[in-house]
């Protein structure tokens, strides 16, 4: 949670933020949880596993759409021994088996237990009525395909957090560079990387098997609507983006810029109040780039 939450500081209790969570954890909200705890968000989740619907609704998700996102055509679901690694892309043993603690072999976390045919749906087709402010995605290499068919949902969004790969652990996987190009064409810029993970390369066998040594594997990429072109933000988008960026992602510098633009347009005084609070805050904890801690 932010050091200086904007909603109570600026009296924005009536501001509602729409979140689209694609590939959610059934029992734990994403980083936006601090906002959700204060009733500031309405969450729509896309979660194809039927057993996830009840726990998602129980933790406050307003609506669950049980579909696989893609191009609207048939696909194959690869179910792995570690369920969290399952997805529509096939694990690539030529890459995975190079790394310490990762394996597609018998008993390995990426071992394919079975495959099954599924039908995908296009994001814009299944959620034409949702105008998200924040989109989060974690669907094992399928993030690019989901967003490529969701231009209508991207039109309202100001912040996107997507799981991304730096090296292809799945066959045909789109990587960070591909995602960056796609989102650039929709007016977004890469803002920061969080929970970056790596692994050592075999045959080295260090004492701490899960610690990274040299190779980037994956992480969470946060994109924002281009803040060098503030005319592309609506007035409400400026406020909502400022709240999300400050309260969820600790980007208080960018939040201040967006508030200043809102003040210029609407005659409010949010930026001055926030700037004064920043100047007197006992400690601030920016998140520029973070490594994922491993047990």
List each model region and its residues.
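Phosphate/nucleotide-binding beta-alpha loop and adjacent structural elements of enzyme active sites
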Residues: 1-295
């Amino acid at each position: 949670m932010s050091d200086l939450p904007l909603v109570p500081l600026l009296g924005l209790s009536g501001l509602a933020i729409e979140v689209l969570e694609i590939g959610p954890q059934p029992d734990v909200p994403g980083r936006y949880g601090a906002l959700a705890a204060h009733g500031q968000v309405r969450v729509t989740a896309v979660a194809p596993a039927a057993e996830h619907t009840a726990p998602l609704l129980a933790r406050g998700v307003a609506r669950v759409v049980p579909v696989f996102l893609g191009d609207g055509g048939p696909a194959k679901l690869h179910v792995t021994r570690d369920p969290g690694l399952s997805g529509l892309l096939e694990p690539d043993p030529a890459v995975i088996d190079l790394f310490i603690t990762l394996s597609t072999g018998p008993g390995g976390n990426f071992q394919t237990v079975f495959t099954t045919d599924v039908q995908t749906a296009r994001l814009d087709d299944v959620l034409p009525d949702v105008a998200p402010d924040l989109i989060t995605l974690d669907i094992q290499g399928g993030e690019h395909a989901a967003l490529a068919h969701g231009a209508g949902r991207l039109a309202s969004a100001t912040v996107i957090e997507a799981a991304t790969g730096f090296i292809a652990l799945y066959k045909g996987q789109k990587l960070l560079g591909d995602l960056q190009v796609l989102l650039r064409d929709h007016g977004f810029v890469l803002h920061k990387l969080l929970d970056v993970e790596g692994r050592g390369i075999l045959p080295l066998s260090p004492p701490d098997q899960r610690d990274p040594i040299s190779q980037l594997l994956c992480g969470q990429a946060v994109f924002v609507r281009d803040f060098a072109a503030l005319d592309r933000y609506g007035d409400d988008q400026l406020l909502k983006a400022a709240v999300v960026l400050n309260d969820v992602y600790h980007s208080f510098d960018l939040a201040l810029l967006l508030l200043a633009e809102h003040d210029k347009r609407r005659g409010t005084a949010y930026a001055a109040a926030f700037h004064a609070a920043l100047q007197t805050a006992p400690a601030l904890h920016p998140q520029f780039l973070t490594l994922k801690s491993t047990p």
